[in-house]
Amino acid sequence: MKISIFSGGRGNKNLFQAFAKEQCEHELNIIVNGLDDGASTGDIRRLMDYKIHGISDFLKTITAFSNDPFIDVMEIRFPKNSNFLEKIKMISTIYQFLEQNITPEFLTNSKTKPTESQLKFIKENLLTFIENVYKFREEIVDLSDYKIGNIIFASLLINNNLDFKVSIKKFCKICNIQSNVNILEAAKLPLNLVGILKNGTLLPNEASVVLSRTTDLIQRTYQINNPLSLNQIRKISSLEKNDKIQYLNALETTTDSNIEVLNSLECSDLIIYGSGTPYSSTLPSLEYLGVADKIASNNCPKILIANLQKETDNFLGTSSLIEDVIKFLTKSSTLKHDPKDLITHILVSNNNEIENKIVFDIQELKIKFPWITIIEDDFNDPNIKGTHNGSKVLDSILNI
């Protein structure tokens, strides 16, 4: 069986771990857009002149499929630098590690201690990363709060001329991912995500789209070629709402979906819209040109995994999420597709004990979307409230 899954970073972790645990032989094609731009991921994008996708969601997806102990090592972060002296101390620590073979305390004192061979591998990739950044930008990287895994992936990109596809495959090999699991770029062109709230507030980057701590809903997101400059942010923020929308409309970019994604959607036996942060993870991947045409022409089940818990006060409800899946898919095509050909099933949880549970009305769903088969069960993970029970979701999907 061939399965295509639209995914972000963390939202489908338990499902992916269930696939790995069961050692399923199905061909899995995981579609990730890489619009993330927060923290060290955003810094790496900047250091590479925004010629690459955000790497964080790709790494989270890949490592979810791996049982290799090195995964825990790659989760280790460099200490946060809160002032100038701590930055100087960090530079000294890195020098001692690279030149004097003195292992930093944050590595030796970590819960998961790297082996000698792992330390050597980390050192090689760290040197490649910071040396190349200095060579081409004359900038010493501030590694505050950087993940080891991010540095390794950035080094792979440098060694492979920023070829994302090749770097993904090599990182998968490092993580010992099964050969039947393919991680695909949703689009080849690296883009940047911005948005606007219904009250007119600008969301100037992907991080603000994800972390919009407000009860006001997101009205629209836009994918643009270059990140907004400070001058652009100031200018847009000073405009009235309609003028803001007009400005962002002019910046918006449309691009083709990755041909590998289109081929996968065309031949899939199951297409899954995974759970996660909708406006940054799943939905943007649906608006790349060609996606809806391939999904609509395939008669396989198309399954939406509804989120269990609100991440923010303005998080989408289940009914709104279905509407947005259809709306974003519509943007990817000049043809008018019947919604029945775009989504056929939805998985919703009937566990009412989840904190900040996303409320839905089964009868409302049946009235608004009568063609959708609703699969209702307790999909909550008993060990981690608010996350999916990966094995139960997997069983439900494979039994459709």
Describe the role of every protein-language-model region.
Residues 33-238:
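Electropositive, gly/pro-rich neighborhoods at or near active sites that engage anionic ligands
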Residues 1-4, 10-30, 38-41, 150-272, ...:
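Conserved catalytic alpha/beta core of Sir2/sirtuin-type deacylases, generalized to analogous enzyme cores
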